[in-house]
């Protein structure tokens, strides 16, 4: 007769929760970046300056989460740093959604990252680049812009990741 392990009312062991938090800290920013790049490449939705800021925070979270898998002795600290980066992206997304709604004033300058070209090449690139304003919604689902969705998903995920990482029992 086969025996089964006793069913426990407890949630997963702390180590298992930390591994789950680690996985979420990797999957959430990767999925959000995939969605952002997918909408850019296939949907023609080019990012504004604040969209890039949100992406940079997710770019920071991914290597932290990967490093946490490689260094299990430092996992909790690395996962919490990844959660912080995800929360920063969410906070920027919340601010960006507020700019889109007219609640906050947006940035007033635009920047260019072009280097190593002649003045004529730079002018040609500037004129060919799509002009994307931070205060205009390019796409929305149920009245919530992409920046708003990033805020909702990122802040929620950061909270869950932090809770899973810090919960001892």
Residue ranges and their predicted role:
Residues 50-60, 142-155:
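Membrane-interface loop-to-helix entry segments
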Residues 101-147:
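Extracytosolic (periplasmic/ER-lumenal) interhelical loops and adjacent juxtamembrane/interface segments
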Residues 163-169:
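Membrane-interface capping segments at transmembrane-helix boundaries
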Residues 45-55, 108-111:
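Non-cytosolic membrane-interface motifs at loop->transmembrane helix junctions
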Residues 15-27, 67-90, 159-160:
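Interfacial segments of alpha-helical transmembrane regions
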Residues 29-46, 65-68, 125:
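Immediate flanking context of iron-sulfur cluster ligation sites
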Residues 1-18:
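Short, Lys/Arg-rich, polar N-terminal cytosolic tail immediately upstream
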Residues 31-40, 88-103, 120:
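C-terminal TM-helix exit segments that contain a strictly Trp-centered aromatic cap at the helix terminus
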């Amino acid at each position: 007769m086969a025996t089964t392990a006793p069913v426990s009312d407890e949630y997963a062991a702390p180590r298992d929760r930390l591994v789950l938090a680690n996985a979420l800290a990797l999957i959430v920013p990767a999925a959000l970046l995939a969605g952002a790049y997918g909408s850019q490449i296939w949907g023609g939705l080019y990012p504004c300056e604040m969209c890039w800021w949100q992406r940079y925070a997710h770019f920071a979270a991914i290597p932290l989460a990967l490093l946490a898998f490689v260094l299990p002795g430092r996992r909790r600290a690395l996962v919490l740093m990844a959660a912080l980066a995800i929360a920063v992206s969410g906070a920027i997304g919340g601010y960006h959604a507020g700019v889109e709604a007219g609640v906050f004033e947006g940035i007033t300058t635009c920047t260019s990252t072009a280097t190593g070209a002649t003045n004529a090449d730079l002018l040609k690139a500037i004129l060919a680049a799509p002009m994307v304003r931070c205060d205009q919604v390019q796409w929305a689902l149920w009245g919530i812009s992409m920046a708003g969705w990033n805020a909702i998903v990122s802040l929620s995920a950061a909270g869950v990741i932090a809770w899973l990482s810090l919960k001892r029992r």
